[in-house]
Swiss-Prot record:
Localization, UniProt: Mitochondrion inner membrane
The keyword Transport belongs to this UniProt entry's keyword annotation: yes
GO cellular component: mitochondrial inner membrane
Subunit record text: Component of the cytochrome c oxidase (complex IV, CIV), a multisubunit enzyme composed of a catalytic core of 3 subunits and several supernumerary subunits. The complex exists as a monomer or a dimer and forms supercomplexes (SCs) in the inner mitochondrial membrane with ubiquinol-cytochrome c oxidoreductase (cytochrome b-c1 complex, complex III, CIII).
Protein name per UniProt: Cytochrome c oxidase subunit 2
Spans within the Mitochondrial matrix topological domain: 43-60
Residues annotated for Cu cation A2 binding in this entry: 192, 194, 196, 200
Residues annotated as transmembrane: 21-42, 61-86
Keywords: Copper, Electron transport, Magnesium, Membrane, Metal-binding, Mitochondrion, Mitochondrion inner membrane, Respiratory chain, Translocase, Transmembrane, Transmembrane helix, Transport
Cofactor: how and how many bound: Binds a dinuclear copper A center per subunit.
Mitochondrial intermembrane side: 1-20, 87-210
């Protein structure tokens, strides 16, 4: 897991999927029960019957309570996600990421500056990923917590790496913050996911955890 919040995001998504599956199962079961009951009564009376349903306070309270409990469970998980999103983790070092048209600039350790551009197709080597290779990669240490500050200079960019569960907007005049942590060595790829101009699809992101 590389992004601190990715665990809680996956946990929340799994909870929603389980809840939706349970609700769908209950709805299908109730529909099947009603349909089979209507058919059974119709065959016994040899007519197509219509029923007059009356209100039931017990059923209203029951369904309201069950639905409220499910909603409360999802709300608590969402509150945990928001809490960890604003929690200040003790980080080993700081990395600044600035988006330009159409490349990324990384400021590492307060003094190292890396300009990351898309390499030309003529410079590709065997095994390189098209539109995902850049001339300089962001190299970070695994098992180390990093704090990333993200901003932009010209237009709105989006620092997105799907394998890490990361998608943060880089807005001129504003500094957004995320925390990265990798438990193993890996190389991850991403791109700018904001329509930032004619070369929007040519801003690759490569992070190598060593």
């Amino acid at each position: 897991m590389a992004f601190i919040l990715s665990f809680w995001m996956i946990f929340l998504l799994d909870s929603v999927i389980v809840l939706l599956s349970f609700v769908c199962f209950v709805c299908v079961w109730i529909c099947a029960l009603l349909f089979s009951t209507v058919l059974l009564v119709s065959k016994l009376n040899n007519i197509y019957c219509t029923w007059d349903f009356t209100a039931s306070k017990f059923i209203d309270v029951y369904w309201f309570t069950i639905g409220g409990m499910f909603s409360l469970g999802l709300l608590l998980r969402l509150c945990l996600l928001l809490y960890f999103g604003h929690l200040n983790f003790v980080s080993f070092d700081l990395c600044k990421v600035v988006g330009f048209q159409w490349y990324w600039v990384y400021f590492i350790f307060g003094e190292t500056t890396i300009f990351s551009n898309l390499i030309l197709e003529s410079d590709y080597m065997i095994g390189d990923l098209r539109l995902l290779q850049c001339n300089h990669v962001l190299t970070l240490l695994s098992l180390v917590i990093y704090k990333l500050w993200l901003s932009a200079v010209d237009v709105i960019h989006s620092f997105a790496i799907s394998s890490l569960g990361v998608k943060v907007d880089c807005i001129p005049g504003r500094c957004n913050e995320i925390v990265l942590f990798s438990s193993n060595n890996a190389t991850v790829y991403g791109q700018c996911s904001e329509l930032c101009g004619v070369l929007h699809g040519f801003m690759p992101i490569v992070i190598c955890f060593i």
